[in-house]
UniProtKB/Swiss-Prot annotation:
Organism: Homo sapiens
Name of the protein described by the UniProt record: TGF-beta receptor type-2
Main function: Transmembrane serine/threonine kinase forming with the TGF-beta type I serine/threonine kinase receptor, TGFBR1, the non-promiscuous receptor for the TGF-beta cytokines TGFB1, TGFB2 and TGFB3. Transduces the TGFB1, TGFB2 and TGFB3 signal from the cell surface to the cytoplasm and thus regulates a plethora of physiological and pathological processes including cell cycle arrest in epithelial and hematopoietic cells, control of mesenchymal cell proliferation and differentiation, wound healing, extracellular matrix production, immunosuppression and carcinogenesis.
Cofactor(s) it depends on: Mg(2+); Mn(2+)
Effect of L452M: In a breast tumor; signaling of TGF-beta significantly inhibited
Effect of R537C: In LDS2; has a negative effect on TGF-beta signaling
Outcome following mutation: N435S: In a breast tumor; signaling of TGF-beta significantly inhibited
UniProt signal peptide: 1-22
Keywords linked to the UniProt accession: Aortic aneurysm, Apoptosis, ATP-binding, Cell membrane, Craniosynostosis, Differentiation, Disease variant, Disulfide bond, Glycoprotein, Growth regulation, Hereditary nonpolyposis colorectal cancer, Kinase, Magnesium, Manganese, Membrane, Metal-binding, Nucleotide-binding, Phosphoprotein, Receptor, Secreted, Serine/threonine-protein kinase, Signal, Transferase, Transmembrane, Transmembrane helix
Pfam families: ecTbetaR2, PK_Tyr_Ser-Thr
Keyword Disulfide bond: yes
Catalytic activity: L-threonyl-[receptor-protein] + ATP = O-phospho-L-threonyl-[receptor-protein] + ADP + H(+); L-seryl-[receptor-protein] + ATP = O-phospho-L-seryl-[receptor-protein] + ADP + H(+)
Subunit structure: Homodimer. Heterohexamer; TGFB1, TGFB2 and TGFB3 homodimeric ligands assemble a functional receptor composed of two TGFBR1 and TGFBR2 heterodimers to form a ligand-receptor heterohexamer. The respective affinity of TGFRB1 and TGFRB2 for the ligands may modulate the kinetics of assembly of the receptor and may explain the different biological activities of TGFB1, TGFB2 and TGFB3. Component of a complex composed of TSC22D1 (via N-terminus), TGFBR1 and TGFBR2; the interaction between TSC22D1 and TGFBR1 is inhibited by SMAD7 and promoted by TGFB1. Interacts with DAXX. Interacts with DYNLT4.
Amino acid sequence: MGRGLLRGLWPLHIVLWTRIASTIPPHVQKSVNNDMIVTDNNGAVKFPQLCKFCDVRFSTCDNQKSCMSNCSITSICEKPQEVCVAVWRKNDENITLETVCHDPKLPYHDFILEDAASPKCIMKEKKKPGETFFMCSCSSDECNDNIIFSEEYNTSNPDLLLVIFQVTGISLLPPLGVAISVIIIFYCYRVNRQQKLSSTWETGKTRKLMEFSEHCAIILEDDRSDISSTCANNINHNTELLPIELDTLVGKGRFAEVYKAKLKQNTSEQFETVAVKIFPYEEYASWKTEKDIFSDINLKHENILQFLTAEERKTELGKQYWLITAFHAKGNLQEYLTRHVISWEDLRKLGSSLARGIAHLHSDHTPCGRPKMPIVHRDLKSSNILVKNDLTCCLCDFGLSLRLDPTLSVDDLANSGQVGTARYMAPEVLESRMNLENVESFKQTDVYSMALVLWEMTSRCNAVGEVKDYEPPFGSKVREHPCVESMKDNVLRDRGRPEIPSFWLNHQGIQMVCETLTECWDHDPEARLTAQCVAERFSELEHLDRLSGRSCSEEKIPEDGSLNTTK
């Protein structure tokens, strides 16, 4: 059971392996375990296989034609030379199906893997006393998920294949003819149009770049704005890449690195500061997810990171995928809270803007009333929230986000996986017991994570009195990077939550914030507030502060601490 390097903790798109057939630099080769590096006859590096790995399970699959393994666990084989194997057995009592990785040089169940180089898992019957025994092996990713029994699927039955090809060919001729005609017409149209525009493009190239720079003006070290709103949520469809010069590395995550960069303006020395998030080739899926989220024009909001464009680039290190966004010099919220103690006004501003950003993300319409696809972040934490120059928050890092498309089935939602950062996972995510019949349950997990971030803000607010050094949620109870099992013990078994000291409640405003975040991290998902309700509570706090004419005193909050809001 323990031979796979990865056994189903994350969905496949998060653990993509690139099949690189190029030479690894010598200094990298020296740092890699020799058991994990194998080369083929051409000297190219061979990486471990991705296979279904469920060991022995009962199965309803018969030995007619083909069937799926129904194995939900994808494993990266322990050694590069291992291939995917499936074993089907039937005796008087039951049918079992076994899916594993195995070295073809070694016998398995006393049989040699004769077809290890095959791209498909075509079953062959083996002689075993007292049972019917079929086995197959193959060498393409997850090839042991679809197991084939019937000779109809093999080239050894040429007559049947000939009939199939003839029928298929005759059926495809009419639509194929139409498709070819459409392609020819479209090609002629594009060629004619491009000839007309070619001269205009050559003469206007510089002018267009100037217009782009003017509309996308980013104010350097200015408190007014980090980037103009006119350029948010664009995709660079031009073949010409933006003139960007990378400056310094400012952040590094699981999937990408973030650089401060200069967007040059024409041939002058002027430039605008932007952030460039660079994904390596093997993290294409994460880049595409985030790009698709940003591409929604209705996502645009003051508390969501403003997006310029997405690009594919070829470099000396290979193909890279770039996301170009506004740059915020104050960094992420975790870094900011580590370096700074905040006032009550700062807390109110940070908390309010965070709730507004999440509420917009979750909403099915824009502030203007246009229909919008609800989105859940699924990895909310203080390091995925940026602090703007005006001390408001904006959400970033949508690599694990999910669009709540009403056409998604329960199975589609179930396949979205247990994702996020363990420290910030809601109880139902840790326990894998989300209500997939109700898409609101995904939003409720974001609200739980938001509550932990609000607690982080409150713990660094000087309005509560003594302020301790920054500490993440559950900081003293778990290690620096806790695993899911460790968080289960704290959150599920012990029903633990971050501590709220009694002296915090001496400040009426802080008391209301604590009541709000306590309702947001309730163990029952349906009992939690919505992000919109939290935003409304912060708005009322701000309104009461303005009425009082003070910004930092608890007297600005009514003595009874009442707020009239609903969920």
